[in-house]
């Protein structure tokens, strides 16, 4: 029997509905994307200036069947080919998560397939493995709307939290400042675009915290920006939105970059990866690439389409769990406050 006959490919169907994207994907061996379908709801939430949970859930219900069918069709696979179904079980919006979890449970039952629950942030981390194989020990900087964390990994599926935000996540701060500047939703990309046209003319605070801490804090920065805008209005002064964006972004990016660099050095890692929606930010990407250039370990940032929520990353993370023998029962429930462990 040849080696190819001995080792069968592992094909996983991934499902992601934790926030405002309904997504399904088929991934082979945790590395090869066979299909990656995403139905975004940005237009539906734009007029509200943020994600409305009830609307998000309704859209997921409308889209989930179509998205799943499209993912299977585009991958050109049958249900016989699929080894397991991986689904985001948390964290996220509970109503949104339930749509994906229930769809996954129904399919697992009907098609007699193993079910694997996946942590959303583990998914963001494993989006990187769709581009580059992991080399341990490895450091992951996770920056998204709800999370800002530094995670040390010594092997697949092993997550040691060495730093996290003590208040607002970086993405939350971006969204709140964007609303103050009356920018359309989603605010993060809008600030990134404005910042590219502005100058860092305003000295906003950097929260370094304790000397040995890898934690983050963005609430003070957010308040400083809001106060600056309010004070300017009261004095009838006109502040450049571009300069506010550039100054705000410089503060966020410097802290993220320096703490990541310091942690990478202290823990003597072989690889640094960046994950999450804010990893699409061009200011952050440039800062990290500049800081890590010339180092003897690589920095990897996934392409834009793998930074934002998608199901390929859930299938990639689910592959590792599946191969380690992890299985979820059919009473799996959505867990909006699931801890990465």
UniProtKB/Swiss-Prot annotation:
Cofactor: Fe(2+)
Molecular-function GO term, any one: N(6)-L-threonylcarbamoyladenine synthase activity
The protein's Enzyme Commission number: 2.3.1.234
Primary enzyme class: transferase
InterPro entries: ATPase_NBD, Gcp-like_dom, KAE1/TsaD, TsaD
Source organism superkingdom: Bacteria
Reactions listed under catalytic activity: L-threonylcarbamoyladenylate + adenosine(37) in tRNA = N(6)-L-threonylcarbamoyladenosine(37) in tRNA + AMP + H(+)
Family that this chain belongs to: Belongs to the KAE1 / TsaD family.
Protein name: tRNA N6-adenosine threonylcarbamoyltransferase
Lineage: Bacteria, Bacillati, Bacillota, Bacilli, Bacillales
């Amino acid at each position: 029997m040849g080696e190819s006959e001995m080792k069968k490919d592992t094909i996983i169907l991934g499902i992601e509905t934790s926030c405002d994207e309904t997504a399904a994907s088929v991934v082979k061996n945790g590395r090869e994307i066979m299909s990656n379908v995403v139905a975004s709801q940005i237009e539906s939430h734009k007029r509200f200036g943020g994600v409305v949970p009830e609307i998000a859930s309704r859209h997921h219900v409308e889209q989930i069947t179509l998205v799943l069918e499209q993912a299977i069709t585009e991958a050109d696979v049958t249900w016989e080919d699929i080894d397991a179904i991986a689904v985001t079980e948390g964290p996220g919006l509970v109503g949104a998560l339930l749509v994906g979890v229930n769809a996954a449970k129904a399919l697992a039952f009907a098609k007699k397939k193993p079910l694997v629950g996946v942590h959303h942030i583990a998914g963001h981390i494993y989006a990187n493995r769709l581009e580059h194989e992991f080399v341990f020990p490895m450091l992951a900087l996770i920056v998204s709307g709800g999370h800002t964390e530094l995670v040390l990994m010594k092997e697949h599926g092993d997550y040691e939290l060495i730093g996290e935000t003590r208040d607002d996540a970086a993405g939350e701060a971006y969204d709140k400042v964007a609303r103050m500047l009356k920018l359309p939703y989603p605010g993060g990309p809008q600030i990134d675009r404005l910042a590219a046209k502005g100058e860092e003319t305003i000295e906003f605070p950097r929260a370094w915290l304790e000397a040995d801490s890898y934690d983050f804090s963005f609430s003070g920065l957010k308040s400083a920006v809001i106060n600056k805008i309010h004070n300017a209005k009261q004095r009838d002064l006109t502040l450049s939105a571009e300069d506010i964006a550039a100054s705000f972004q410089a503060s966020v990016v410097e802290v993220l970059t320096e703490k990541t660099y310091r942690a990478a050095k202290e823990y003597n890692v072989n690889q640094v990866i960046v994950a999450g929606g804010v990893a699409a930010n061009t200011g952050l990407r440039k800062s990290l690439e500049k800081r890590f250039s010339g180092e003897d370990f690589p920095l990897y940032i996934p392409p834009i389409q793998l930074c934002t929520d998608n199901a390929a990353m859930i299938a990639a993370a689910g592959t590792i769990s599946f191969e380690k023998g992890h299985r979820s029962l059919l009473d799996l429930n959505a867990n909006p406050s699931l801890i990465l462990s």
